[in-house]
């Protein structure tokens, strides 16, 4: 259940109550695709750096270790030792990214495993059953993610199919939640708005799925080929057509600057692999933009990554030391940078929430973007 606490322009400050705890929004979901953050970051680390909610992937976990294995071990929370909310992606984005290996039918999608090439089928019911086995807090509806740009006629047909699939997802999750052996019989369902960069399709689809009274609504099919300006325009068209009393999630986005722009347009939830992926490659976010620790100028730099940061990495280690670890190919280098980047993102969201509470979000956003000098 979502409670809107404060609005500052279109930006929203809220609370999302779940069976696994309350999430303060706007929020960044830390991405643990295979039930772990890449970079040797533990769930204890995540709590220390302020992570409220974690995201894992249905498709990948269904292949390895298998959703039945996780079900038999008590569900994803118990499996990964995490007692806070978890959102599971439906697997749709991963399936549709296998463009040369899949066939879309009304019943679902036929594709080949990226691991061993075996043939797999996934449709709305299969996705819901896998997510029920995982026992995540929030299950995402199975949808088709169309890369931008795409022919309008195809996008229209795809959105209609996604709507039919959403109805099937809702029927199936209601059935699964009513069954006695279901681990989490209060699993929530978020629907996904699609429509590419076509405003009319997006707005009509938002109105249709809003009538289905879901637990939350995501905006998908962005950050897949369109410009930032197109993304922001789509948000301005879609968000006002979604229910104000439900959380709004922008999938797979993005940079800190993207997040600020989307919060200004009313978005509550975000996820992106960028902080962990960039950290593993020695790129770290700071109060003054992104720096690359492998640059020679950091060889004798005994400052922390960011003097304004309070993360465990910045409290204890220098740029020179972390650069040495990368040069020596020590795993600790990746761990320290991923922890720092995730702290940066989670702390950014905390500051955003505080700025909305104070009614000065736009001023906060302006100062941040100027300070980052558009490098974030």
UniProtKB/Swiss-Prot annotation:
GO CC term, one of those recorded: cytosol
Biological pathway: tRNA modification; tRNA-queuosine biosynthesis
Binding site for Zn(2+): 309, 311, 314, 340
Gene Ontology MF annotations: metal ion binding; tRNA-guanosine(34) queuine transglycosylase activity
SUPFAM superfamilies reported for this sequence: tRNA-guanine transglycosylase
Cofactor remark: Binds 1 zinc ion per subunit.
Reactions accelerated catalytically: 7-aminomethyl-7-carbaguanine + guanosine(34) in tRNA = 7-aminomethyl-7-carbaguanosine(34) in tRNA + guanine
InterPro entries: ArchSynthase1/Queuine_TRR, TGT, TGT-like_sf, tRNA_ribo_trans-like
Region annotation (RNA binding) ranges: 252-258
Gene Ontology BP terms: queuosine biosynthetic process; tRNA wobble guanine modification; tRNA-guanine transglycosylation
Binding site for substrate: 89-93, 143, 194, 221
Cofactor: Zn(2+)
Active site: 89 (proton acceptor), 271 (nucleophile)
Record's function text: Catalyzes the base-exchange of a guanine (G) residue with the queuine precursor 7-aminomethyl-7-deazaguanine (PreQ1) at position 34 (anticodon wobble position) in tRNAs with GU(N) anticodons (tRNA-Asp, -Asn, -His and -Tyr). Catalysis occurs through a double-displacement mechanism. The nucleophile active site attacks the C1' of nucleotide 34 to detach the guanine base from the RNA, forming a covalent enzyme-RNA intermediate. The proton acceptor active site deprotonates the incoming PreQ1, allowing a nucleophilic attack on the C1' of the ribose to form the product.
Cross-referenced HAMAP family: Q_tRNA_Tgt
Protein name: Queuine tRNA-ribosyltransferase
